[in-house]
């Protein structure tokens, strides 16, 4: 009676013995299949890099000429949320619940049933 590990090792040995592909032949086949693709991609690479550099220079010129700068802390979007009072938060919460309810009712009317699409 054979143990499972002995059977598996025997199967692996037979598989490796019967395989007629060596690493070298597999590498040669892969090289033969991918060489045309690599040549096409290398032909496209130069125009892509050229236009990427042109775009970068154009963006830099616009950035400097328009005096664009990253937003400062005085215009931070978090200041809007910090300035909200608890009354405003409650009002906005109930407005959001109302909007979600109207959306769900519209979905039910559109599907002509209360349950989801299933």
From Swiss-Prot:
Keywords: ATP synthesis, CF(0), Hydrogen ion transport, Ion transport, Membrane, Mitochondrion, Phosphoprotein, Transport. It is found in: Mitochondrion membrane. It comes from the Eukaryota. Its main location: mitochondrion. GO terms for biological process: proton motive force-driven mitochondrial ATP synthesis. Belongs to the ATPase g subunit family. This is ATP synthase subunit g, mitochondrial. It comes from Schizosaccharomyces pombe (strain 972 / ATCC 24843) (Fission yeast).
């Amino acid at each position: 009676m054979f143990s499972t590990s002995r059977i598996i090792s025997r199967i692996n040995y037979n598989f490796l013995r019967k395989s007629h592909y060596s690493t070298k032949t597999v590498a040669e086949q892969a090289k033969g299949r991918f060489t045309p693709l690599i040549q096409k991609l290398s032909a496209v690479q130069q125009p892509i890099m050229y236009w990427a550099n042109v775009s970068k220079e154009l963006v830099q010129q616009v950035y400097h000429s328009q005096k664009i700068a990253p937003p400062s802390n005085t215009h931070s979007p978090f200041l809007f949320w910090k300035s909200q009072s608890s009354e405003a938060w409650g009002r906005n919460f109930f407005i959001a619940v109302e909007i979600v309810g109207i959306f769900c009712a519209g979905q039910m009317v559109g599907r002509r049933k209360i349950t989801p699409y299933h």
